[in-house]
């Protein structure tokens, strides 16, 4: 079985492409079934395995398969599933085999490959991806082991390095940008659209600035109300957004919608109602919640996750010592995992040896039982049984020794000597 990771992320593709390749949560299970069965070879000797990790910054397919053409098949499947021409998608896709796939998984879970260096959200997202793949019946021995090792490595990296300290989060970056637009965030009305983890983080940072008003709009009114109450804010129905958008100076949106929920026309009307007072908008969703054309409006300052990345990277540069320490830990753990993977390659051979040996044993036992039933001397039957088993079990190694010559023969002799610890060396003439 070969490990393979196929994907795109914020390093290789802009948000405009990433949002087209993202998988909504409810689509992942059926997508896994299709991907695993159609493109990883349901007739393969070993059952193929797969998992899909889809976040704001990456969409990745983790595979374990015998199919040597899995790389091309995975890219083609991703292209067909999302209806994106292969020629458009392929230049942005990375394919990481074996140790590269292992190293990548360890780095992702440890926060080393994130836009926010050392952030912890990705670890939870990866665990969710594993849970979904397990529920879909898409995981097996190889990926299960990979992900369990991945989570252990992430825990070790975060526990023994300072990779997560003093990081500038996306939420903190959003506040910094708002402070560039408005002299005082405390004088502004802030609207949060959504009620997930990212919105909760943003609300925490903005609430610390003491805004004039904090409002949460969410599809599920009860969840939005709970979040608003945590920050002494209030909730409003999401359906009221088009008619009330003009009330807010700062709008932060991050929902799971597959289509934009804020269109150009609605924002144009809001700007007009505000008499062209500026609106600061942050779209943290992938796919995007706000139509990108909104960013062209004169009085609107629209930022996406990619835009916030520049501010985040400023804070990343100061922690390169922690990065080097984390990379060293990961490299050691990659080598350990590859050693385990190498041992797995002999499992089919060992299983076959057991099957063959057991077949020989059963055949000889059956023969012995017939002789005993016939009344033959038990001692003679046992002697014949043991002699037959001995001859048949050493027949393979003996034949191999007689077939090979030269260096191959010497290597095989050394190998056999290891099997049979008391075998005399070839230069021992004592006959013992």
Swiss-Prot record:
Catalytic reaction list: (S)-4-amino-5-oxopentanoate + tRNA(Glu) + NADP(+) = L-glutamyl-tRNA(Glu) + NADPH + H(+)
Listed InterPro entries: 4pyrrol_synth_GluRdtase, 4pyrrol_synth_GluRdtase_dimer, 4pyrrol_synth_GluRdtase_N, GluRdtase_CS, GluRdtase_dimer_dom_sf, GluRdtase_N_sf, NAD(P)-bd_dom_sf, Shikm_DH/Glu-tRNA_Rdtase
GO biological process, one term: protoporphyrinogen IX biosynthetic process from glutamate
Residues holding substrate: 55-58, 114, 119-121, 125
Record carries keyword Oxidoreductase: yes
Keyword Methyltransferase included in the entry's annotation: no
Residue(s) at site: Important for activity: 104
CDD domains for the chain: NAD_bind_Glutamyl_tRNA_reduct
Assigned protein family: Belongs to the glutamyl-tRNA reductase family.
Protein name: Glutamyl-tRNA reductase
Annotated organism of origin: Burkholderia cenocepacia (strain HI2424)
Gene that encodes it: hemA
């Amino acid at each position: 079985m070969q490990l393979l990771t196929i994907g795109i992320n914020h390093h290789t593709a802009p948000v405009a492409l990433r949002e087209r390749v993202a998988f909504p949560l409810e689509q992942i299970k059926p997508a896994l079934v299709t991907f695993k069965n159609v493109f990883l070879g349901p007739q393969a000797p070993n059952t193929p395995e797969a998992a899909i990790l889809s976040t704001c910054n990456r969409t990745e397919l983790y595979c374990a398969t015998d199919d040597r053409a899995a790389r091309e098949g995975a890219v083609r499947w991703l292209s067909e599933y999302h209806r994106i021409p292969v020629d458009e998608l392929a230049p942005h896709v990375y394919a990481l085999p074996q140790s590269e796939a292992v190293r990548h998984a360890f780095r992702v879970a440890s926060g080393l490959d994130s836009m926010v260096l050392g952030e912890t959200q990705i670890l939870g997202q990866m665990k969710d991806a594993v849970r979904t793949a397990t529920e879909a019946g898409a995981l097996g021995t190889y990926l299960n082991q990979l992900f369990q090792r991945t989570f252990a490595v992430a825990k070790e990296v975060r526990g023994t390095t300072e990779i997560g300290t003093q990081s500038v989060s996306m939420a903190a970056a959003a506040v910094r940008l708002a402070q560039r637009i408005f002299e005082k965030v405390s004088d502004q009305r802030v609207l949060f659209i959504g009620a997930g983890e990212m919105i909760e983080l943003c609300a925490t940072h903005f609430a610390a600035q003491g805004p004039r008003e904090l409002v949460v709009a969410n599809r599920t009114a009860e969840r939005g109300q709970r979040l608003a109450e945590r920050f002494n804010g209030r909730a409003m129905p999401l359906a009221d957004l088009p008619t009330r958008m003009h009330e807010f100076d700062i709008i932060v949106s991050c929902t799971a919608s597959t289509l934009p929920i804020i269109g150009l026309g609605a924002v144009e009307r809001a700007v007009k109602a505000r008499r062209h007072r500026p609106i600061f908008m942050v779209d943290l969703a992938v796919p995007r919640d706000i139509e990108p054309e909104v960013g062209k409006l004169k009085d609107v300052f629209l930022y996406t996750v990619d835009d916030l990345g520049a501010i985040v990277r400023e804070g990343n540069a100061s922690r390169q010592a922690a990065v080097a320490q984390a990379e060293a830990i990961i490299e050691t753990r990659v080598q350990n995992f590859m050693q385990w993977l190498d041992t797995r390659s002999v499992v089919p051979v060992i299983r076959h040896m057991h099957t063959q040996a057991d077949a020989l044993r059963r055949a000889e036992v059956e023969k012995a039982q017939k002789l005993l039933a016939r009344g033959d001397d038990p001692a003679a039957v046992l002697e014949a049984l043991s002699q037959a088993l001995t001859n048949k079990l050493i027949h393979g190694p003996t034949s191999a020794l007689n077939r090979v010559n030269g260096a191959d023969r010497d290597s095989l002799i050394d190998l056999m000597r290891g099997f049979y610890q008391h075998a005399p060396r070839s230069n021992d003439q004592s006959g013992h």
